[in-house]
Amino acid sequence: MNKIAKTVLMTGTALCAAGVVLSTAGYFAGGKDFTYTSDHMYVSGGNSSSHKNLAVMKKEQIDDFTKLNVDFQDFDLDIRTSDDDHYYMEYKLEKNGTKNPLTWKDKDGELTLEESAGGSGSYYITYDLGIFSKHVDLTQKKDALNTVILYIPEKAQLSEAELQLSDGDLAADQLLCKEMTLELLNGDLMLDKGEFEKFDAKFSDGDLNVKELQCTDNMQLKSGNGDVTIKKAELADGQIALSDGDLQMGNSSFNGDMKINSSCGDVSVEMKNGSAEKTNIYLKAADGDVDTEGLSRGKTDNEEDTSVYENKAGASAPTLNVKCSDGDITLTESEK
């Protein structure tokens, strides 16, 4: 073994040994006091006594409500399906000082949740846990720190909901609401099923991931810096605007006039089988390509950096209008 290789080996061994020593010291100094939250590990900055500085509400039944107001600075919101016909709430929140970090009021069918000045900010470190990811998922469902968890009956529909989260995520099994107003400044939305009449959502810096979305009246969606993924959609009138991010929509149908504008990002729309020819479609990519391979009708025109596709189905037919300033447009139909 030459001198350089021997030096490298000895240095690596020394660093590994130092890492073991430091990890062990950190563990016994309070590093073991951590918990999992959505998509990341939460690492508490305190020692073992930090558990004493928590505001805890074990799962407890609350009054029924049809209106929901939420205003959080750092907390996450998790809406789950109740196992029965009752409403419940639980949380485990860090606090600064003695003040409860959450103020809430449930009166006359209206639930209001507001993060107070007593809340504590969070510090996150993300790890790829590989084979341990399943364990993390189970743990985070069981014990979520700095997350308010609401349980709503499966068939319950809210009349109004206004949710504002500055630096937190929103996760929901389902949201059934006539009028939904949502604003996330720096967080993600993970929604399995959403049914709305009116849906107004704004995202400054975060991703939107929805498995199933239905909006029967009007939808307004603005995304600043993040990707939007909707696996299945049934939409009426509305507009989707993206500043910097990709849009992916699968198995979608449009029953009104829908406009999609993307400043910087690709747009991919999969329409429900057989619906494209019955829809007025106008696609324009100013600095990109338009791909409509597989569609039997419509006209494509390419000039320099601009690509256009158009299909005319009649004045009474629904309309899909997609424009990309810097990105590609892909339009397909589902197999079934």
PLM regions and their residue ranges:
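Acidic/polar low-complexity surface segments
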Residues: 122-141, 294-312
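N-terminal start-of-chain detector that recognizes signal peptides
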Residues: 39-43, 50-51, 60-63, 83-86, ...
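Short, surface-exposed interaction patches in beta-rich subdomains
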Residues: 192-193, 199, 208-223, 227-336
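Hydrophobic membrane-insertion alpha-helices, especially the h-region
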Residues: 9-26
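Short linear S-[DN]-x-LW-Φ motif typified by the pepsin-like aspartic protease active-site region
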Residues: 26-116, 122-123, 143-164, 169-183, ...
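Conserved Rossmann-like nucleotide-cofactor binding loop
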Residues: 168, 187, 206, 226
